[in-house]
């Protein structure tokens, strides 16, 4: 593998992906995802936007102290205060990057920035020079680049390269471009930019027209050697380019691209499942690579062909992307040390002995209900337990559901708020409705339910049900998750989890005037 054919994978799940409505993660959840991304083999982890809030700064800083192989990056606007906060946040990382940006399209410069092109260039150059005080690895992005004038882009990119930028990122911020135009744009821009051959060119594509992956691949054909993407394509609006699709497209169609990545493809599905569990965003069954149906064959002709020779209808194996990782993990006789070791193997570290003891107690309860415990069960269990460890949270204690044909279901539920036990009862059009009404009779949150979903963690009737609840109130949108072999218990846990984030979680407003690439 040479530098010319090596593609750098820049994962922004923890920054751009987290901007999906309700996908905000706690610091501990971000660290879990970062560890899995490092295991996946991504080159750059964009850990967040350090200047956006104190919580963001803490999360970026914690990831910088945790990750040793991947480069840890923070986004920042082309503003000195932002850049210095980013530099301080990533300082502990063995390998660190600052990613600074400013808008370059005529519409953004005129209406958002209210700056002249010359002023934008001056701000960009100053930003890169400040970033170089903290690290030699500086990325510069031209927000809304694909709607910018190419001659102006060449001028500003040449200026920031001279100032010390080592990576130039060209985002399709609003998902406007189409593949052949993207390839042409990159080819022309790289040639026109002074010293354009001395830096790594990067693509960051949004999926508003469903073309994020196609545009990213086209950018590679046009000379880019870094792709910015997210697990499961998570991101604002219609999302970002998905890391799994880009990586497997390059691997399966190596004959066309001749490009390599450093990704361990067997970690793709585990990464997808972890991000889905933590964010509460389920993966659609027909999603390429990581969807539950990605390797299913219903047609008799297809089934016959696959049985005779797999490659008749499969261009890659399920095992190559990690579907074989649905392994039996532990059983009811497994001890605490075996449990702790298994969590470490899965990249899960709990912050205290108290947290480990609580998770182990939950594991033993689960093992009594479910004969076979799989890796996915442990991920769901730990996510559920970590969500209830906060002392200032809503915590599930117990519930009784009464249903009879022709009668309204009734829910009697016991839970606590800040350690104070509460009891509530309600009837509803169904058991789920009754549970939500019972909780709300005490919580009085005033939140609107946006999404309620249930997914089986593993196969079989003994599987844990993993539920997601999305609540909205004002400009706050939160996701809550719950897991249990009883889906109605999981439902109550998910609703209480969402309420905990809504009432006690720190709000995370964007920094004033911030944009997104």
Swiss-Prot record:
PROSITE patterns named in the record: AIPM_HOMOCIT_SYNTH_1 (PS00815), AIPM_HOMOCIT_SYNTH_2 (PS00816), PYR_CT (PS50991)
Enzyme class, UniProt record, top EC level: transferase
Top-level lineage group: Bacteria
Recorded GO MF terms: 2-isopropylmalate synthase activity; acetyl-CoA C-acetyltransferase activity; manganese ion binding
Positions of the UniProt region annotated as Regulatory domain: 395-517
Job of this protein: Catalyzes the condensation of the acetyl group of acetyl-CoA with 3-methyl-2-oxobutanoate (2-ketoisovalerate) to form 3-carboxy-3-hydroxy-4-methylpentanoate (2-isopropylmalate).
Subunit structure: Homodimer.
Official protein name in the record: 2-isopropylmalate synthase
Taxonomic placement: Bacteria, Pseudomonadati, Pseudomonadota, Betaproteobacteria, Neisseriales
Gene: leuA
């Amino acid at each position: 593998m040479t530098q010319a054919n090596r593609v750098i994978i820049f994962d922004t799940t923890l920054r751009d992906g987290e901007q999906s409505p309700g996908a905000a993660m706690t610091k501990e959840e971000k660290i879990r995802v970062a560890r899995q991304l490092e295991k996946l083999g991504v080159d750059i982890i964009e850990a967040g936007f350090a200047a956006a809030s104190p919580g963001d700064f803490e999360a970026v800083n914690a990831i910088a102290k945790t990750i040793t192989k991947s480069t840890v990056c923070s986004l920042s606007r082309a503003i000195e205060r932002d850049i210095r906060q980013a530099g301080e946040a990533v300082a502990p990382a063995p390998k660190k990057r600052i990613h600074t940006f400013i808008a370059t399209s005529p519409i953004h410069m005129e209406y958002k920035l209210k700056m002249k092109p010359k002023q934008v260039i001056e701000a960009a150059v100053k930003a890169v020079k400040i970033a170089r005080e903290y690290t030699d690895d500086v990325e510069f992005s031209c927000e809304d680049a694909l709607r910018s004038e190419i001659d102006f882009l060449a001028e500003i990119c040449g200026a920031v390269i001279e100032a010390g930028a080592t990576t130039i990122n060209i985002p399709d911020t609003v998902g406007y471009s189409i593949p052949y135009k993207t390839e042409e744009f990159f080819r022309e821009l790289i040639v026109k930019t002074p010293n354009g051959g001395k830096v790594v060119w990067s693509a960051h594509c949004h999926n508003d027209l469903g073309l994020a992956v196609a545009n990213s691949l086209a950018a590679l054909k046009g000379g880019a050697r870094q792709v910015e993407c997210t697990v499961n394509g998570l991101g604002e609006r219609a999302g970002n380019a998905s890391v799994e699709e880009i990586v497997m497209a390059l691997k399966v169609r190596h004959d066309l691209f001749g490009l390599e990545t450093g990704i361990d493809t067997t970690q793709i599905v585990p990464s997808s499942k972890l991000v889905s569990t933590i964010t509460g965003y389920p993966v659609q069954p027909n999603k390429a690579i990581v969807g539950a149906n990605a390797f299913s064959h219903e047609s008799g002709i297809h089934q016959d062909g696959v049985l005779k020779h797999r490659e008749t209808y499969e261009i890659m194996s399920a095992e190559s992307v990690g579907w074989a990782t649905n392994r039996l993990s532990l059983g009811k006789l497994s001890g605490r040390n075996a449990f702790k070791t298994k969590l470490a193997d899965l990249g899960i570290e709990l912050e205290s002995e108290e947290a480990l003891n609580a998770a182990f107690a939950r594991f033993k309860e689960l093992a009594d209900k479910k004969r076979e415990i799989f890796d996915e069960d442990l991920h769901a269990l730990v996510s559920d337990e970590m969500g209830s460890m906060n002392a200032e949270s809503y915590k599930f204690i117990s519930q009784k559901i009464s249903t009879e044909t022709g009668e309204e279901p009734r829910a009697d539920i016991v839970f606590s708020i800040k350690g104070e036990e509460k009891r509530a009862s309600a009837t509803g059009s169904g058991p789920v409705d009754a549970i939500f009404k019972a909780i709300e009779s005490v919580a009085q949150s005033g939140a609107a339910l946006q999404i309620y979903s249930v997914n089986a963690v593993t196969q079989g009737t003994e599987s844990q049900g993993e539920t997601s609840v999305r609540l909205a109130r004002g400009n706050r949108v939160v996701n809550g998750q719950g897991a249990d072999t009883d889906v109605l218990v999981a439902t109550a846990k998910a609703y209480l989890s969402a309420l905990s984030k809504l009432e006690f979680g720190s709000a995370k407003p964007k920094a004033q005037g911030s944009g997104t690439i």
